[in-house]
């Protein structure tokens, strides 16, 4: 099984709807340890992405991903714009001219994107950031390469949720939350949460 470029477009469309629905939830999380703008920023950025989708729906997956990244870079404020923008731009590098992706190609695409996040944000596993959720996703996908496409995504979603919730007892080492020191402990990281929501949308789109 593969994921088609039409399903990639559907993924981004679903993500826009999810970030619209979850704007207040993400902002409430960010109010505890950040600038209280993560939900607003993610919603605004992905609404702009959604507006661009009709213009790239017939393009290859790499072009779709790169356009998404450039749109997020120009429309999201705070730290999340550069990080998510970089994720999509770097993800595009291995999927230019691709019309569909198998599980290995999808995993490599996501790995390239996460490598970009790490290089840009300098976050490591355990720093209480979106990198924690991405690590859970990629570790799971790499272990499930012989599993069916949807089963592999299902297991990765479960690991993403575990990693997201795993940020609650951590002390933040990066971003605005790090200024709180030990007071950041006990709160779920907003970026780890938006990454979980984004990947959950990918799983949903792949099943359609």
Model-flagged regions — what are they?
Residues 1-208:
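N-terminal loops that bind phosphate or other acidic moieties
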């Amino acid at each position: 099984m593969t994921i088609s470029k039409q399903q990639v477009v559907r993924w981004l469309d679903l993500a826009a709807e999810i970030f619209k629905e979850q704007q207040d939830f993400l902002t409430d999380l960010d109010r505890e340890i950040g600038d209280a703008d993560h939900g607003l920023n993610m919603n605004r950025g992905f609404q702009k992405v959604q507006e661009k989708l009709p213009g790239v729906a017939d393009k290859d997956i790499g072009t779709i991903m790169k356009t998404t990244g450039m749109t997020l870079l120009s429309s999201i404020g705070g730290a999340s714009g550069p990080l998510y923008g970089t994720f999509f731009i770097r993800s595009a590098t291995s999927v230019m001219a691709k019309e569909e992706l198998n599980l290995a190609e999808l995993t490599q695409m996501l790995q390239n994107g996460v490598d970009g996040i790490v290089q840009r944000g300098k976050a490591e596993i355990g720093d209480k950031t979106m990198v924690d959720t991405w690590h859970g996703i990629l570790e799971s996908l790499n272990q499930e390469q012989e599993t069916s496409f949807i089963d592999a995504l299902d297991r990765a979603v479960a690991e993403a949720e575990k990693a997201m919730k795993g940020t609650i007892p951590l002390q933040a080492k990066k971003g605005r939350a790090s200024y709180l020191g030990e007071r950041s402990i006990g709160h779920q990281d907003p970026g780890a949460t938006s990454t979980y929501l984004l990947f959950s949308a990918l799983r949903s789109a792949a099943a359609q």
